[in-house]
Amino acid sequence: MTIGYIIGSATINEATAILEQKIRAGYYVILEYDGDKILGLITNVYTGSPLLDDNLNDVKFVQRIKQLEANKIPFFIKARIKLLCKLDGKFTQPDLPPVAGTPVRLASDEELSTVFSAGDVRIGKLIGSNVEVKIRLNPLSRHLAILAATGSGKSNTVAILSQRLVEIGGSILIFDYHGEYYDSTLPNLNIIEPKLNPLYLSVNEFATLLEIRENANIQYRIIRRTFNQLKEEINNEIKEGKTSLAELNSNFFERLKVKIEEEGRNEKRKESKDEVLNKVEDFAERYSDIIDITFGDVINKIKLGKINVVNLSSLDEDAIDAIVAHYLRRILTSRKENKIKKDSGLKFPILTVVEEAHVLLSKDTNTLTKKWAGRIAREGRKFGVGLIIVSQRPKGLDENILSQMTNKIILKIVEPSDKKYVLETSDNLSEDLADGLSSLDTGEAIIIGNVVKLPTIIKIDKFEGKLSGSDPNLTEEWKRAKEEEIVHSDVSDWG
């Protein structure tokens, strides 16, 4: 059914149509001309009246016009159409613009299915249709950003994507910043404790956690020698059955401090030795909740076909940063090991999800996580490690990392500076699509990148289970607290 006609001048990229009725932005249309069938996307809809145009300066004239019956006031509806591709099986770019008068009609479900339903995993439906949207999985190795304002559907998107991935046997690891997923009803959950085992830390990683920089030569040398010596001793003791992991948990740092004292006996090293001892004591106190030698290697705790969740909600930012950075390092290095020797390391590809990425991957702060997330963004594709970053503050993200997220699922974004930042760091996001981000409803998104053939405006499927991070019902909680207060008061009166 024809809904309008092309008017004015057009290019091979966009055109303007005058419409017979209001059509929401985000709908897909078909233009047929020069023997081709062209798929277009309505990016903007606006109305006006030749009687009440922008040049009108007389308010009394408007009042007189308003006295007419509404259906006697002439008005028009126009739309901007982004021309996407030819529906020729190859989805090539149009090479000729449409001429004025070219009819515009809504695309049929059958036409849209050839473009948007040919992927591997369904995550929703096209806005305004029953056409399911399936994304391609292999391009996720080139990473994904899920960006949105608070309350626009980020957690639901992560839940749906995770659920659909494990349904086909995939593996995903979510760093659960707010505890939304570990206590959810997501299927195939595998909960991993947020623990650090010092025996699996590299010297550089341990020194960084101690805040000893490599250019602090003497301090770095002291910790390198003592840490390596202690790890070797402990590993030998474990092999020979001379100690228990529980015992090591209680005396690891004391043994390390003894070795540091021995290493720093030279008078010239006394000041550096004392500095290292202070830093070890600070480290043991600051990270006491997450240090655990009984924990083992996190690689052995990640399961294939599971939604692996690390619950970080009880930790402070320093501890979260340490955990996420270490796990990302172990995952990347372990996948590299597997590439060289098939029976070692992590034996299957994995997608890692970093929530609150504007905190852990901030453009203004050099976090531990940023180093290893950056490495995965650059190298992960070759070794089957995908990075998914989730944020409600895109402008706070490190530009280099965000620009390497080839794929993006962008839900509602209202803040102009956020939209501008996303546009600047996205090769395949056009300005007209970015302009429409603020008009999206909750759960609606624009998908760009190699996971889809074309920019896709979608309603993400609703996760039907329970996530734990929903906003509290204040009135219900106040009411319940009041009732409990009354009960306690009554019990006290009985006593």
UniProtKB/Swiss-Prot annotation:
GO BP term (any one): DNA repair
Catalytic reactions on record: Couples ATP hydrolysis with the unwinding of duplex DNA at the replication fork by translocating in the 5'-3' direction. This creates two antiparallel DNA single strands (ssDNA). The leading ssDNA polymer is the template for DNA polymerase III holoenzyme which synthesizes a continuous strand; ATP + H2O = ADP + phosphate + H(+); Couples ATP hydrolysis with the unwinding of duplex DNA by translocating in the 3'-5' direction
Chain residues that bind ATP: R142, G151, S152, G153, K154, S155, N156, K459, I460
Expression induction: Part of the nurA-rad50-mre11-herA operon, these genes are cotranscribed.
A GO term, aspect molecular function: ATP binding
Enzyme Commission code(s) on record: 5.6.2.3, 5.6.2.4
InterPro entries tied to this protein: DSB_Repair_Helicase (IPR053460), HerA-like (IPR008571), HerA_barrel_dom (IPR018538), HerA_C (IPR033186), HerA_central (IPR002789), P-loop_NTPase (IPR027417)
Residue ranges of coiled coil: none
Entry keywords, A to Z: ATP-binding, DNA damage, DNA repair, DNA-binding, Helicase, Hydrolase, Isomerase, Nucleotide-binding
The protein's enzyme class: isomerase
Activity regulation: ATPase activity is slightly stimulated by either circular single- or double-stranded (ds)DNA with a weak preference for dsDNA.
Origin superkingdom: Archaea
Tagged with keyword Isomerase: yes
Pfam families: DUF87, HAS-barrel, HerA_C
UniProt record similarity statement: Belongs to the HerA family.
Protein function: Involved in DNA double-strand break (DSB) repair. Probably acts with NurA to stimulate resection of the 5' strand and produce the long 3' single-strand that is required for RadA loading. Has DNA-dependent ATPase activity and bidirectional DNA helicase activity. Loads on either a 3' or a 5' DNA tail for subsequent DNA unwinding; has no activity on blunt-end DNA.
NCBIfam families attached to this UniProt entry: HerA_Thermprot (NF040937)
Binding partners and assembly: Interacts with Rad50 and Mre11.
Name of the molecule in the record: DNA double-strand break repair helicase HerA
Source organism of the structure: Sulfolobus acidocaldarius (strain ATCC 33909 / DSM 639 / JCM 8929 / NBRC 15157 / NCIMB 11770)
Name of the gene encoding the protein in the UniProt record: herA
